[in-house]
From Swiss-Prot:
Assembly and binders: Tetramer of two alpha and two beta subunits.
Keywords for the protein's UniProt record, in alphabetical order: Aminoacyl-tRNA synthetase, ATP-binding, Cytoplasm, Ligase, Magnesium, Metal-binding, Nucleotide-binding, Protein biosynthesis
Record InterPro entries: aa-tRNA-synth_II, aa-tRNA-synth_II/BPL/LPL, Phe-tRNA-synth_IIc_asu, Phe-tRNA_ligase_II_N, Phe_tRNA_ligase_alpha1_bac, Phenylalanyl-tRNA_Synthase, tRNA-bd_arm
Gene: pheS
Name of the protein in question: Phenylalanine--tRNA ligase alpha subunit
Organism: Sodalis glossinidius (strain morsitans)
Amino acid sequence: MPHLADLVVQAKADIERSQDIEALELVRVEYLGKKGHFTQQMTALRDLAPDARPAAGAVINQAKQDVQQALAERKATLEGAALEAWLAAETLDVSLPGRRMENGGLHPVSRTIARIEHFFGELGFSVATGPEIEDNYHNFDALNIPAHHPARADHDTFWFDATRLLRTQTSGVQIRTMKAQPPPIRIIAPGRVYRNDYDQTHTPMFHQMEGLIIDTDISFTNLKGTLHDFLRNFFEEDLQVRFRPSYFPFTEPSAEVDVMGKNGRWLEVLGCGMVHPNVLRNVGIDPEIYSGFAFGMGMERLTMLRYGVMDLRAFFENDLRFLKQFK
């Protein structure tokens, strides 16, 4: 076994030769580990006379401390060098542009609603809203929809009980408005509506917008002109538009409106008609003095036609790859 002083010199030399933390750890184990040189020195104390052991043990401990201090200093030096090397490798190019925050965008259905609100706002229409949980009167009775009408059936309507339901149309907003203010009235009523249907072109919840004008001398000609202008503005082209006779309990006469698609086929876009005299009477408006027209359209359907979307359900799946197309 080498002399203790020589052992310290040898240990310090090995420590200085260590070029990284892993090599330094091997040196520590060689000298200070369970089977290391200094452990062997301590074990050899039992061969000394009892009165000589304390002094010899103190010398060995001092030598161990010298080696431990040398290890700590070398470790600090190696860690500092490693940090400097890492910092040098990670140097930032301050001339690079920063990461920009990605801007969000309006949902395509929200874009459609905003576009329609803007158009009718310029014509003097105001936006009216109402509750989504309705009662029989506002959703059916006041709109001249009889008790036997199919729309009241469970397979079409979400009922809470015998009198309360999720509204199937925003027409209830028109009833509330006509009862709350005298003519002239000019409103649009956007909002969520609910029907028990789900397929490629229907969802249980969708967005609808209805419009209403009540005033003196309102005719079907006014209705046609308003909707012609709206459709040409919305689709941004001079479309062919046709009005087909139809039936709605709350309007008379009633019509459905089609536009000519790019494939040469007629596409239904909305329903409309002159407000039925019974509806006016139900809200206390004299049909002998006042008349009006109403129209209703599905926001998802118009959005599909405007942007060429084939499946209505895509609007509600929150797929960012789909939604980012409408920024």
